[in-house]
């Protein structure tokens, strides 16, 4: 899977775990809903570390916790 797909899946999983909506996350971090929608459906060509930091912060976790998931193992990612 691509990095964008891994971020999308992780974000979706965390929102479910935290029982939080995309809208609530957007309100909390001040991000446009279209941006988070594009991230959640892997429609962004790239997602910056800064954006992932804001998403993680809005979910009440650290950047490390966001990335510390098997989705981000090198064997699971197609990195060109």
Residue ranges and their predicted role:
Residues 1-20:
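A short, Lys/Arg-rich alpha-helix, primarily the initiator
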Residues 8, 41, 68:
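Phosphate-coordinating loops and pocket residues in cytosolic domains that bind phosphorylated ligands
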Residues 12, 23, 53, 64:
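Residues within the helices of the helix-turn-helix
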Residues 15, 26, 56:
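The alpha-helix within a helix-turn-helix
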Residues 19-38:
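Short alpha-helical DNA-recognition segment
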Residues 38, 67-80:
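Short, charged recognition helix plus adjacent turn
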Residues 43-54:
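Short, basic-rich loop-to-helix N-cap that marks the start of a DNA-contacting helix
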């Amino acid at each position: 899977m691509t990095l964008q797909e891994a971020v999308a899946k992780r974000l979706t999983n965390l929102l479910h775990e935290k029982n939080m909506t995309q809208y609530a996350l957007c309100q909390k971090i001040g991000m446009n809903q279209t941006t988070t929608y594009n991230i959640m459906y892997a429609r962004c060509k790239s997602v910056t570390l800064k954006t992932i930091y804001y998403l993680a912060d809005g979910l009440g976790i650290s950047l490390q916790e966001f990335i510390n998931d098997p989705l981000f193992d090198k064997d699971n990612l197609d990195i060109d």
